[in-house]
């Protein structure tokens, strides 16, 4: 057998070392990925379930559009206001919607870490001027959870978020995105006779007339309403509805007082409602056909 000279021997051992290093590196990749995956994922809720029952205010702000909605619990009711009226006009929330939002935020979900520094926030639409902010607040003004949400990924259908106190970006698959709206019409009770006033269930209210979009207008004191209608509900609550004609449709301004079974806080809540909304000519006609028969 031919013996290798010194130079050939060194080349052989160098080549063997290189192959060995590559083999070790390739062999360790699955373990590295597995370990990294374990470290970068977790099952956690965005809102501590222990605080869920104490949430009395939810703030939503879209930093891209500068629109905001604030929902507050007053008595047993949820009352909303929004930036379109400079948070002046108050409207009743859609029944059970705030509770469903809180429940979804406090549900434990699977999260995967996508980034760990603020420089990556722009890649996920999570920088301060481009995200949607949600704050869940307690009775003393404390913020239980401050969250920032980016855009939904068109491919994975998932959404990323971060918290106020951390730069970590987490990707989640959650129904939380169903509630991430600063459109007041999404949150407002859709019925002309709101459920917080009537006390009716969803099934009982399903046949009631619905109103159109919220209106941010203030009729001049010199303009008298076209019609004023008073409604006494079965629970002894009362509503007064003023109808104004505008551009082929109608603007309705309701006022309410609570019934005898209402707590003081609930009575104050319904009395504070100051919203107004539009209805179509058809809805106007149906309303008086039903109520004046």
Regions from the PLM with identified roles:
Residues 1-293:
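Secondary-structure "cap/kink" motif recognition
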């Amino acid at each position: 057998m031919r013996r290798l000279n010194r130079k050939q021997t060194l080349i052989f051992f160098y080549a063997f070392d290189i192959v060995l290093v590559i083999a070790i590196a390739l062999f360790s990749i699955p373990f590295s990925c597995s370990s990294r995956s374990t470290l970068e994922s977790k099952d956690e809720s965005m809102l501590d379930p222990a605080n869920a029952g104490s949430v009395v205010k939810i703030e939503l702000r879209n930093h891209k559009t500068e629109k905001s909605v604030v929902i507050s619990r007053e008595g047993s009711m949820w009352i909303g206001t929004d930036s379109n009226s400079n948070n002046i006009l108050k409207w009743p929330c859609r029944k059970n919607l705030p509770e469903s939002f809180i429940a979804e935020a406090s549900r434990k979900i699977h999260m995967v870490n996508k980034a760990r520094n603020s420089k990556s926030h722009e890649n996920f639409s999570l920088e301060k001027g481009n995200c949607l902010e949600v704050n869940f607040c307690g009775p003393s003004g404390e913020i239980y959870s401050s969250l920032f949400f980016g855009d939904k990924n068109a491919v994975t259908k998932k959404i990323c978020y971060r918290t106020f106190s951390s730069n970590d970006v987490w990707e989640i698959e959650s129904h939380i995105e169903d509630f991430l709206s600063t459109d007041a019409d999404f949150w407002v009770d859709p019925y002309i006779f709101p459920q917080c006033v009537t006390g009716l269930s969803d099934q009982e209210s399903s046949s009631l007339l619905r109103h159109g979009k919220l209106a941010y207008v203030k009729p001049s004191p010199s303009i008298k309403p076209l019609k004023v209608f008073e409604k006494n509900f079965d629970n002894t609550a009362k509503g007064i509805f003023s109808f104004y004609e505008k551009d082929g449709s109608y603007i309705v301004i309701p006022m309410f007082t609570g019934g005898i079974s209402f707590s003081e806080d609930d009575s104050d809540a319904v009395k504070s409602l100051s919203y107004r909304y539009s209805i179509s000519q058809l809805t106007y006609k149906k309303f008086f056909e039903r109520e004046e028969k």
